[in-house]
Amino acid sequence: MAKSRKVVIPYAPRAAFAEFHDRSERWACIVAHRRAGKTVAAINQLIRAALRCERPQPRLAYVAPYTSQAKDLAWGYLKQYTAPIPGVRANVSELRVDLPNGGRVRLYGADNYNRLRGIYLDGVVLDEYADMDPRAWSEVIRPALADRAGWATFIGTPKGRNGFWEIYEKAKVSPDWFALRLKASQTGLVPAAELDAMRGELSVDEYAREMETSFDAAVAGAYYA
């Protein structure tokens, strides 16, 4: 039998995300202000799950609204935090990292969500879900979790009362869901002086939405309902 090897990932969770990492619920929803660190937390959750999964050939996915956005938001973090793992292989053309236990973490864009048809998933993070077509979840991603009883985490900043709001409302009252809401005025992650400056530069609705995670702030332009 091969000996297990201790691997230390260079990630120190922010206190605001400690309960997220310690949760036991299968489903999770995080509504967080800008620059809270939600993508870093989510990527490390995927890495840990891929390393600890007891099923053969674990498959984990990170989904952003667009493939280019997934690369910009998460690829650097995925490479950074998996770099210390012996035998890890990064494939930039496919935006995936292969781990020595057979696990794989891959980045996708919801703009081409049918690319996920036919695959299985042990876990998935949907980042900035408010900007996604909800059919990506209901028609493709949710069925991909079924046979392996995979988990899902929805994260993002509000954009009105759309599909992300519906997910959060469900998460708040369902026993099999974990819900977390992080407002900049409460977390202390953004310096107070910076928040004061932003209040003078952003509109009232923009600040309420981006920093105070308000679902009721007005949103310019169209979004999926």
What is the role of each PLM region?
Residues E25-E94, L182:
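Conserved P-loop
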Residues W27-C29, R59-A61, V105, G123, ...:
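Residue-level preference for the first positions of well-ordered beta-strands
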Residues D131-L202:
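ASCE P-loop NTPase helicase motor core
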Residues T187-A225:
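ATPase catalytic-site recognition across NTP-hydrolyzing enzymes
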Residues T67-D122, F215:
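Inter-Walker segment of RecA-like/P-loop motor cores
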Residues M1-W27:
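Pre-P-loop entry segment of helicase/translocase ATPase cores
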